[in-house]
Structure formats: structure tokens, C-alpha cells
């Protein structure tokens, strides 16, 4: 998901406000008694996922902002509510790139400047992500952690381009210097959580594109990067984080099925170092209609079935009529062979600093929309499992 400039500022403001609030200590935040998982690593079994020994279809959500919170109690609250609701997977942004160090205590993970990169392992850096992983372990929630953003939100590939030289984000994929810095960051993050059962999968990027590039550019980067991640960690799964562009199966000739953004869904899914497929759905941004989304979901399910790997319906959202629009997509995903889980964009909750960021797609815990798209959806998942 690409955030609007207003949303990016709102996220920063939320983090800054949280800094001014009393901070929960690790001992205080450990007072609840959540039930963790069984300590096993998530995996695939044919066209399905396996979480804590359970094979089936799973529901989850996205939270780009949770790793930037500075109040531990807020992090615990999110995972407590997710656990209560039956959400099993949360996709979080494992990047927060800047070109100059913030002066106000804002959380940042990596700084790129003058051809060099500095990883922040301090209290306003990766220690915030540490707590997210720690709390997820306690609550039995699995995390998808990605390493860079295609978009400029929280730095993205453009932060590398600004520091190392280049014209646009497409230069990121072939630059030796940028890739060296990117891989150093991957190694720093992966090494911190190598033995954590909370990690569902490592993800190369949020919505990587290479507009106007030959398909080989993005594919070769996916191939080499996923091999590198597997060389560091063979226990956790690896995925791309792409939108699912570039697909012939079920194609109606519309923009998302085409290859203009440099992606080839089928070709990259076939890589042995990619454990499952990912795809997103935003009809309003792609020039399609909401009903079109059901065919998009079915097409990716068919592609994953043909590849013998599960598909994760990783992001989907609209800014109005959430239940009426998104419920059919959920049901299509649940009933399509090859689709193994879905994560709506995005999770919302009431934090100590106020409501979590709302980009219009947000579904807040405890609301009627949450009942429709989470509570009822998870009941449908349970009902299907019982029928089987």
C-alpha cells in the first residue's frame, strides 16, 4: 500500500505523541497471561499454511505503524485484541529509512547519507521492532517482516537512491552499492530474530515495481535476494511482497494483469527460494471495479495451484462501504483452491495516544465493520474447517 503524504505525517505525529506518554516497562507489559503458540516455525503443506501445528486457512491484517510505537503497552494491546479476535498473522514494516537523523526522537531504523548507511540498533531504532517480535511471541501471533518499501513512505528505495546516486527507484535493483547496503540491513534484521517462532516469513519489499524495465530485472533481483535470505535463514519462509502484476492466467487485458510494472507473477513464484505467492487488491487505484476483484483473486489462486504453492491474499482495501465490498473478496479467497490466507489492509485500534492511523481503509477493533470483516470471516473459516 502506498500511503498518502498526509498519512505519512499522521504516522510520524502518532509516534511523536507516544514518546511523550509514560512508557510501559517490559515487566509491566508482561503482566497479562497471553497464550503463545507451540513454538514451531510456520511452513507450507501443499497449498496450505501450517501455523503452530495447525494446517488450514488463516486470517490476519497489516500494520505498518506498530514497529514505530514507543509505548510497549500499545503493542501488547494490539496483539491481545488480535489474539482474542482469532487473527493469526500480522504484516509489519520492518524498514524505516531516513536520509538525516531525526532530531525529535522519532523512531528510525536506518539512515542513508553521503554513500553510507547506518543501522540504528538503539532504543529509538530496531529495539522497537524487538519488542514487537517479543510481544508477538507471547501472544502467538505470526509476523511478516519486509525490508524496504518501493514507495517513498518511511524512506523506501528512494532513500537509498538519494544517498548513493541515481535517477529513480528502478536504479535500486542494479546498483551494487545500494544492494550491498540493503543486504547488510537484511542480515542485521534476520540475525536478530533467527530463532523466533513469531516470524511467519521474511519479505523482500513492499510492492516492488520496476516500471518500464525488462521482466528479467525484477525477477533476477527477486531470485538473488531470496537466495541470500535463505543463506542466512533456512528455517523461516521467504516471500516477495508484490502486488501480483504480470499474469496470463485469467487475464482480461487490464493494467494489473499486464507486465508494464516489470513483474512476472508466475515466473517469480516458480523460484525455489520463494515459498508462497503474494498479491494485493486495490481496484480504485488500478482503474478497475470492485466486482473485478473476485476474478483477480481466483486467477492468483489458479496460478498458485498450478505452481504447487499457496497464495497469500496479502493486502486489500477500499475507503468506503468496507463490508459490502470486501466481504465478497474474502469469501472468494476462502473458497478458492490455492489461496491459503488473507490479510486485510489495515488493522486499527485505540492506542494510548488516540486512534491508530486511518487511511480510509482502516478497520478498527470493536466496530461493526470489524464484526463483519473479522469476527464473521473467522467464523466462516472455522465453519469451512469443520465441514472438511
From Swiss-Prot:
One of its GO terms (molecular function) is mannan endo-1,4-beta-mannosidase activity. One of its GO terms (biological process) is mannan catabolic process. InterPro entries: Glyco_hydro_5, Glycoside_hydrolase_SF, MAN-like. It is found in: Secreted. It catalyses: Random hydrolysis of (1->4)-beta-D-mannosidic linkages in mannans, galactomannans and glucomannans. Its EC number is 3.2.1.78. It holds the Pfam family Cellulase. Residues 1-20 form the signal peptide. The active site is at residues 207, 315. Coiled coil: none annotated. GO terms for cellular component: extracellular region. Glycans are attached at residues 264, 335. Endo-1,4-mannanase, a crucial enzyme for depolymerization of seed galactomannans and wood galactoglucomannans. Belongs to the glycosyl hydrolase 5 (cellulase A) family. This is Probable mannan endo-1,4-beta-mannosidase A-1.
Amino acid at each position: 500500500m502506498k500511503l498518502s503524504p498526509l498519512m505519512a505525517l499522521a504516522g510520524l505525529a502518532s509516534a511523536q505523541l507516544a514518546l511523550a506518554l509514560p512508557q510501559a516497562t517490559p515487566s509491566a507489559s508482561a503482566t497479562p497471561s497471553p497464550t503463545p503458540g507451540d513454538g514451531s516455525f510456520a511452513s507450507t503443506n501443499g497449498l496450505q499454511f501450517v501455523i503452530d501445528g495447525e494446517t488450514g486457512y488463516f486470517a490476519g491484517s497489516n500494520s505498518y505503524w506498530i514497529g514505530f510505537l514507543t509505548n510497549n503497552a500499545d503493542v501488547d494491546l494490539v496483539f491481545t485484541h488480535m489474539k482474542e479476535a482469532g487473527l493469526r498473522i500480522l504484516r509489519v514494516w520492518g524498514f524505516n529509512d531516513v536520509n538525516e537523523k531525526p532530531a525529535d526522537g522519532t523512531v528510525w531504523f536506518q539512515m542513508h547519507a553521503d554513500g553510507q548507511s547506518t543501522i540504528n540498533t538503539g532504543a529509538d531504532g530496531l529495539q522497537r521492532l524487538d519488542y514487537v517480535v517479543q510481544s508477538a511471541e507471547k501472544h502467538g501471533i505470526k509476523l511478516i517482516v519486509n525490508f524496504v518499501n518501493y514507495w517513498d513512505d518511511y524512506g523506501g528505495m528512494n532513500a537509498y537512491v538519494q544517498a548513493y546516486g541515481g535517477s529513480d527507484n528502478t536504479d535500486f535493483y542494479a546498483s551494487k552499492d545500494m544492494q550491498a547496503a540493503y543486504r547488510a540491513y537484511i542480515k542485521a534484521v534476520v540475525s536478530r530474530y533467527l530463532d523466533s517462532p513469531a516470524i511467519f516469513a521474511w519479505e523482500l519489499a513492499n510492492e516492488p515495481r520496476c516500471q518500464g524495465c525488462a521482466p528479467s530485472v525484477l525477477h533476477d533481483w527477486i531470485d538473488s535476494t531470496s537466495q541470500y535470505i535463505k543463506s542466512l535463514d533456512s528455517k523461516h519462509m521467504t516471500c516477495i511482497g508484490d502486488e501480483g502484476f504480470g499474469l496470463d492466467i485469467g487475464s482480461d487485458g487490464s493494467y494489473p494483469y499486464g507486465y508494464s510494472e516489470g513483474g512476472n507473477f508466475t515466473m517469480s513464484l516458480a523460484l525455489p527460494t520463494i515459498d508462497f505467492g503474494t498479491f494485493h487488491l486495490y481496484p480504485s487505484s488500478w482503474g478497475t471495479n470492485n466486482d473485478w476483484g473476485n476474478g483477480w483473486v481466483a486467477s492468483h489462486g489458479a496460478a498458485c495451484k498450478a505452481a504447487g504453492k499457496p497464495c497469500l491474499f496479502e493486502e486489500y482495501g477500499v475507503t468506503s462501504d468496507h463490508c459490502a465490498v470486501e466481504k465478497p473478496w474474502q469469501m472468494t479467497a476462502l473458497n478458492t483452491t490455492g489461496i491459503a490466507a488473507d490479510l486485510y489492509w489495515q488493522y486499527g485500534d485505540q492506542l494510548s495516544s488516540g486512534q491508530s492511523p486511518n487511511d480510509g481503509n482502516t478497520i478498527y477493533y470493536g466496530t461493526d465493520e470489524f464484526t463483519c470483516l473479522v469476527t464473521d470471516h473467522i467464523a466462516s473459516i472455522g465453519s469451512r474447517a469443520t465441514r472438511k
